[in-house]
C-alpha cells in the first residue's frame, strides 16, 4: 500500500494532465498535501494511506483550527479530493471522508469594492503618468502604456488576475473587440471589450509591444524582459497606481473585479449575464454582489419606498 507522499504525486499528476487544472491550483494543492504529510510525521502517525482514518482527520482539523475558515475549507477540500480520487481509482478500500460531516462556518463578508469616483481617480492618475513621460524614450514610457492597458482591461472585463496574467496574444481579437480567457477548471469564455478608451489602450499597447510579445512566446502582457507579466507584478502596479492616485485603502486586481460586478448590478444588469462575464459556475457565487451600497440604498428607499404614497392629515401628525 502506498504512503501519502506517493498518493499525492498520483493525485497531482491526475489534476494536471487529466483535469487540466491551473498552475495556481496545483501549487496550492501541493502545499496543502505537504502540510498534511508533515502533520502525520510530526505527530508520529503512520503515513500509509490505508492507516488514515476519521480520527486522524479530526486531529488534523484541530491542528489547523486557528487558520482562517476559508483556508481550512480549502485544505480539507484538497485532502478530500485526493481520497475521492484514490477511491475512484480503487487504490483504497475505505474512504475516511465517507459519512464524515465537516462544517466550517465562514463569515459572510461583503466584497471590497470601489465606487465609480475611486475608479475614475485611478484611471486619471494612470493616464497622467503617461502624459508626464511622453517625451521620454525607452521602457519607462512603454511601461506606462502597458499599465494603462492592464487597468483598463481589468475594469472593462472583470477578469481574474490569473486570467489576465496568462492571457494569450491569440486570444485577444482587436478586430472583433473581444478576448477569450481560460478561467477556473480550464473553462473558456469570451468577453466583449466595448468601451472606446479600453479598446484604444489595448491597441496602443499592442502596436508598441507586438514584436516583443511574439518574441516572448505569445503571452499578451509582458514585462521588460519580454516574459509573462506575473500576477504579483499586476498586483503591485495596481496597488501603486491606486496609492499614488490618493486612495489609501488597499486596492487589488480582485477589488477591480468586485467593483466591475457591483457597478454593473447597480446599473440593473441581469445577474445571470454578470455570472457569465465573471466565469462563475454557480449563480450562488455571483449573488454575493447583490449587496447594495449606501448611496444606492438611500436612493432606492427615498424614491421607491411605499411610505411616500401615504396621505395623512396634518392634524393627526400634530404633537
Pin down the residues of each PLM region.
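Conserved catalytic core of the tyrosine transesterase superfamily
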Residues: 1-319
Amino acid at each position: 500500500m502506498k504512503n501519502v507522499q506517493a498518493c499525492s504525486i498520483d493525485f497531482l499528476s491526475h489534476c494536471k494532465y487529466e483535469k487540466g487544472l491551473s498552475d495556481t491550483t496545483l501549487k496550492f494543492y501541493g502545499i496543502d498535501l505537504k502540510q498534511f504529510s508533515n502533520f502525520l510525521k510530526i505527530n508520529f502517525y503512520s503515513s500509509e494511506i490505508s492507516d488514515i482514518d476519521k480520527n486522524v482527520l479530526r486531529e488534523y482539523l484541530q491542528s489547523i483550527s486557528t487558520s482562517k475558515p476559508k483556508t481550512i475549507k480549502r485544505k480539507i477540500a484538497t485532502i478530500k479530493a485526493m481520497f475521492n480520487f484514490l477511491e475512484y481509482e480503487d487504490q483504497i478500500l475505505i474512504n475516511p471522508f465517507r459519512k464524515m460531516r465537516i462544517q466550517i462556518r465562514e463569515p459572510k463578508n461583503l466584497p471590497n469594492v470601489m465606487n465609480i469616483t475611486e475608479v475614475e481617480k485611478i484611471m486619471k492618475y494612470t493616464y497622467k503618468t503617461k502624459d508626464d513621460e511622453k517625451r521620454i524614450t525607452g521602457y519607462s514610457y512603454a511601461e506606462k502604456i502597458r499599465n494603462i492597458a492592464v487597468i483598463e482591461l481589468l475594469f472593462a472585463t472583470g477578469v481574474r488576475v490569473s486570467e489576465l496574467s496568462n492571457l494569450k496574444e491569440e486570444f485577444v481579437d482587436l478586430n472583433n473587440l473581444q478576448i477569450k480567457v481560460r478561467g477556473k477548471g480550464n473553462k473558456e469564455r469570451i468577453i466583449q471589450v466595448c468601451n472606446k478608451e479600453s479598446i484604444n489602450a489595448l491597441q496602443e499597447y499592442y502596436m508598441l509591444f507586438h514584436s516583443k510579445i511574439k518574441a516572448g512566446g505569445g503571452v499578451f502582457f509582458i514585462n521588460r524582459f519580454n516574459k509573462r507579466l506575473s500576477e504579483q507584478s499586476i498586483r503591485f502596479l495596481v496597488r501603486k497606481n491606486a496609492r499614488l492616485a490618493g486612495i489609501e485603502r488597499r486596492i487589488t486586481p480582485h477589488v477591480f473585479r468586485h467593483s466591475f460586478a457591483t457597478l454593473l448590478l447597480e446599473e440593473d444588469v441581469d445577474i445571470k449575464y454578470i455570472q457569465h462575464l465573471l466565469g462563475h459556475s454557480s449563480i450562488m457565487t455571483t449573488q454575493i454582489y447583490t449587496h447594495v451600497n449606501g448611496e444606492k440604498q438611500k436612493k432606492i428607499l427615498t424614491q421607491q419606498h411605499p411610505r411616500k404614497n401615504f396621505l395623512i392629515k396634518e392634524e393627526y401628525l400634530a404633537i
